[in-house]
Amino acid sequence: VSKVLKSLLLTALLGVTGLISGCGDLTVLNPKGPVAKGQSDLIIYSIIFMLVIVLTIFVLFTIMLVKYRERKDISNYEPDMHGSKKLEIFWTLIPVAIVIALAIPTVKTIYAGEEAPKVTSHKDPIVIYATSADWKWIFSYPDESIETVNYVNIPTDRPVLFKLTSADTMTSFWVPQLGGQKYAMSGMTMNLYLQADEVGTYKGRNANFNGEGFADQRFDVVAQSEKDFKKWAKETKASSPVITQDIYDRLLIPGSSKKKTYSGTHLAFVDVAADPEYVFYAYKRFGYEMTNPHNPNTKSTISDEPMLPVRPVTVTNPQFERHDMKPQIIKNGEGYHEDKHREDEMKKMEEDIQTNEFNKKESDDAGN
């Protein structure tokens, strides 16, 4: 009896523990913006839809167990087995219909998230570059000329276009109460529209494991009224220190960081999405070397001051759409250097040189 009692108590304890573990705030189902609301509605719809299917199956299963169970009054039951094309077609179409019923709203919600919310699509979105760097988030406001670390202020009732990229490892940008996650990857820029309808502070984080500092890569989204946001932006720009290339390169060194605020943005001298190898030069500048995290005896000594000059880049490209500021990495007449140019860039440079030489020859021949 004691063994049975112990087993029951252990089972009850594990059950209570499991129930308590689920008592946290389900932020995904507590949306504070139109993007998150659409995704929350999709989740609830999918759960209810699948519960109906599961309950239907269990009801049918129970009926079959009860109706066709072995009974004393029916000793020999011979099932009437024969083929039925109608039934076969019917139960083949059922899963097809289920997939369609789930796929249509899912696809609609996904595509709706690729554009500004319809309720505020007439408003000009605020554009914020969100750059992931182990293990911190760097937010750049090109219009307001502000840069923040591990927190971002946004106005309410206005679409926000986050341009996501990563300076190093792949991460995932996620603010559960404002919208679903999207990957931030090196060498590319991903667009993510979000919007907050209520004033407040919302928690954001990296949702993709990327090493020992993963748990610390969190940030706050501070939603303010339009008036308060403009006031904050004006005061922040006037009172914060100017971000320099030295400061930015130091931020790229792996490690956690407190909240920081700067005037200006790093987009003035580099866009890591267009120059994904920039981070490695930043490592060299401060003497950082990647080590084995599983070996406590391997450490990397980081210099307080840069040991190499800044990497020269030029950011002037009017051909790109608004805020897509790409560095002109290859300059006219500049040679190839493995620390600065990729193979495809070298090929492009050679093609340009050949084209220029051909045009010059054609011009000279025409003059003669």
PLM ranges: what are they?
Residues 19-22:
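C-terminal motif of bacterial Sec signal peptides marking the signal peptidase cleavage site
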